[in-house]
Amino acid sequence: MKPLRASVFAQAILAFYFQVIQWLPLGNWNYQPGFPPLGIQAIHGHATAQDVLLMTAFVAPFVVFWFAYSKGLRWLMWIGTCGYAVWLALEVKTWWVAYAFGATDSWLRIYQRVFSRSTQLLPSLGRHLPPDGMHLVLQVLLTSVVVLAVVGLLKTSVRVDST
């Protein structure tokens, strides 16, 4: 599969995964005290239009990239890729810096309050707190989206420039 096509596929999986973890209760996979999934909030009449709009907005990058891919709009694909790269950078800053160098007191309190009962796939070593499983999968998907898009866009750039 060509990298750009693979990136579109990875983006579809990412968009689907993000919706699933936001809407459905998946036990400890997406358990966060005080933040019930939107599906539960909707059943109890607590989901707002703003909540639904925000979740819909997370599908927009995939739709825009897919449109740009189908029309050959490389500049728009680059903008989309930059957006995904910023999201990935925020994930790295939030999770991996604390895992590699140790959590600040503030992050330690947040982690214990919100993520201590989440599914863990990586070991926790003292103050070196890993991303929970839900975020780890999200980060793997984001990384694949960004890498595949950049490789695909650079490869198509070489082909366009050499013709």
Where are these regions (language model features)?
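Hydrophobic transmembrane helix segments
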Residues: 14-54
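Cytosolic juxtamembrane helix and N-cap/initiation of the first transmembrane helix
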Residues: 1-17, 133, 145-163
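Hydrophobic alpha-helical transmembrane segments
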Residues: 1-4, 23-29, 48-58, 76-91, 118-147
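Alpha-helical transmembrane segments of integral membrane proteins
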Residues: 2-9, 52, 74-81, 133-140
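Juxtamembrane helix-break-helix junctions at the cytosolic face
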Residues: 59-78
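Hydrophobic alpha-helical membrane-insertion segments
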Residues: 10-19, 78-102
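Juxtamembrane non-transmembrane "cap" segments at the membrane-aqueous interface
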Residues: 95-119
